[in-house]
UniProtKB/Swiss-Prot annotation:
Biological processes, Gene Ontology terms: translation
Single GO MF annotation: small ribosomal subunit rRNA binding
Oligomeric and partner information: Part of the 30S ribosomal subunit. Forms a tight heterodimer with protein bS6.
Family as reported in the entry's similarity comment: Belongs to the bacterial ribosomal protein bS18 family.
One Pfam family here: Ribosomal_S18
SUPFAM superfamilies from the UniProt entry: Ribosomal protein S18 (SSF46911)
Name recorded for this polypeptide: Small ribosomal subunit protein bS18
UniProt-listed HAMAP family: Ribosomal_bS18 (MF_00270)
Lineage, opening ranks: Bacteria, Bacillati, Actinomycetota, Actinomycetes, Streptosporangiales
Stored NCBIfam families: S18
Length: 78
């Protein structure tokens, strides 16, 4: 039996490059929550589709937002 053809997954596009955003603001929690899992962890680059530089910027912004108590370090769900 022949295997069905495997489709290549679509390459994800960096949201920040697409919108031509140069700065990731740590105060924009609605944007940053898209890059955090339900457990409160920062999502990987292969999951979010960010480019390398913007993934670093997102990580720094999330860490700053956590320090300023805008985002939780962990989720409250158990």
């Amino acid at each position: 039996m022949a295997k069905p053809p495997v489709r290549k997954p679509k390459k994800k596009v960096c949201v920040f490059c697409q919108e031509k955003m140069t700065y990731v603001d740590y105060k924009d929690t609605t944007l940053l929550r898209k890059f955090i899992s339900d457990r409160g962890k920062i999502r990987a680059r292969r999951v979010t589709g960010n480019c390398t530089q913007h993934q670093r910027d997102v990580a720094k912004a999330v860490k700053n937002a956590r320090e300023m108590a805008l985002l939780p370090y962990t989720s409250s769900a158990r």
